[in-house]
């Protein structure tokens, strides 16, 4: 009898322990619309929200100290000076992330979307790469490989929605005339070379005087192109390429270096307004690039360790609308799509379990490996 009693006590203790485990990590925190939100996806949304807050931390705030940082105040809008307590900001951003995930999956299904086998393979590959790079950190935050696979699928669905909503056969198609106007008026098509401000053999960096001398030589080459701009993107590219090839030996010689055999090979970029600002972060350079007319060349300080020689071209003279369609559509409509997704997600019925979410508070986030 005594043995049976002990066995019963042990069984009860085991049952209580199992219940405790299930309560500490719920399988799901509920639904938004008809989309189930597993605990792993909730934890990923919360972790991402925390990282967004961490990016807004001031120099004297340490986001690796989670408990204290959650109590801190951050500036969330430099233009208006709006501030927020980190814990409130993380909670709001977590909800917005979940609403976005649910909206993407719902809209994708509504429009008859189906991921291709290649897209699913790509999602799995990206998820595995993330786990290989930061697996310990993800695992410490309760985020497993299956969650990352689902998240990567959501990202691909979001990309597909751009075409499904605004593409040629989309729900609200953008006309070729609208795309053409956007390409010509709002985007900048360039061919360019990046010139390092250091000796590529010794890695000795240019001082201020040497950097200024190299930039002046590059600008002189650009001005020689602008003195007689030929007609057509092909001729403009050829003239620019010749000017670059002629100028590079003297530019590299400032640092006792020589250009490699492919140093004058031109790269191509199509930049939207946000891309231009991000690409040309040195003061005044983004505006200088925007001000160029098709066929005009320039040389600008690209970063603290490189300058860029570039020529702006008419995108539809240098390329075709079909080949530029995806980039132009993304630049034109990505912001609108994101706003509509966020609004759609906020309007979906919410059946989230606050008790379940409280079992996974932001205070348990691990923000260092």
Q: What is the predicted role of each segment?
A:
Residues 1-12:
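Positively charged n-region of N-terminal signal peptides that target proteins for export
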Residues 16-20:
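C-terminal motif of bacterial Sec signal peptides marking the signal peptidase cleavage site
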Residues 23-143:
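N-terminal targeting/tethering segments
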Residues 23-25, 32, 138-216, 276-369:
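PPIase-associated folding chaperone regions across multiple families
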Residues 47-54, 95-116, 125-139, 143, ...:
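Sec-exported extracytoplasmic/periplasmic mature domains
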Residues 61-78, 201-223, 320-322:
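A solvent-exposed, charged loop/short amphipathic helix patch at secondary-structure junctions
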Residues 92-124, 161, 260, 269-273, ...:
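Extended amphipathic secondary-structure runs
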Residues 220-282:
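Peptidyl-prolyl cis-trans isomerase
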């Amino acid at each position: 009898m005594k043995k049976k009693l002990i066995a019963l006590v042990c069984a009860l203790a085991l049952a209580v322990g199992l219940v405790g485990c299930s309560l500490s990590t719920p399988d799901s925190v509920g639904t938004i619309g008809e989309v189930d939100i597993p605990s792993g996806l909730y934890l990923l949304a919360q972790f991402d929200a925390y990282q967004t807050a961490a990016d807004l931390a001031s120099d004297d705030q340490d986001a690796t100290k989670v408990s204290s940082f959650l109590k801190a105040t951050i500036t969330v809008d430099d233009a208006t000076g709006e501030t927020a307590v980190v814990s409130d900001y993380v909670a709001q951003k977590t909800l917005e992330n979940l609403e976005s995930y649910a909206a993407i999956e719902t809209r994708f299904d509504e429009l008859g979307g189906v991921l291709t086998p290649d897209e699913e393979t790509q999602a799995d590959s990206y998820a595995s790469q993330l786990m290989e790079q930061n697996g310990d950190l993800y695992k410490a935050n309760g985020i497993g490989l299956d969650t990352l696979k689902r998240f990567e699928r959501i990202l691909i669905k979001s990309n597909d929605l751009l075409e499904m909503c605004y593409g040629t056969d989309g729900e609200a198609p953008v006309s070729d005339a609208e795309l053409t106007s956007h390409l010509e008026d709002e985007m900048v098509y360039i061919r360019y070379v990046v010139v390092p401000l250091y000796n590529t053999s010794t890695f000795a960096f240019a001082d201020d005087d040497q950097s200024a001398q190299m930039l002046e030589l590059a600008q002189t080459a650009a001005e020689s192109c602008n003195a007689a701009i030929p007609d057509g993107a092909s001729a403009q590219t050829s003239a620019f390429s010749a000017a670059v090839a002629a100028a590079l030996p003297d530019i590299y010689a400032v640092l006792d270096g020589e250009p490699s055999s492919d140093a004058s090979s031109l790269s191509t970029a199509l930049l939207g307004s946000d891309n231009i600002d991000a690409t040309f972060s040195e003061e005044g350079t983004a505006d200088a690039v925007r001000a160029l007319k098709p066929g005009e060349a320039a040389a600008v300080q690209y970063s603290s360790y490189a300058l860029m020689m570039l020529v702006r071209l008419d995108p539809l003279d240098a390329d075709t609308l079909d080949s530029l369609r995806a980039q132009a559509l993304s630049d034109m409509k990505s912001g609108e799509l994101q706003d509509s997704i966020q609004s759609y997600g906020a309007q979906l019925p919410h059946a989230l379990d606050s008790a379940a979410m409280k079992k996974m508070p932001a205070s348990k986030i691990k923000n260092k490996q």
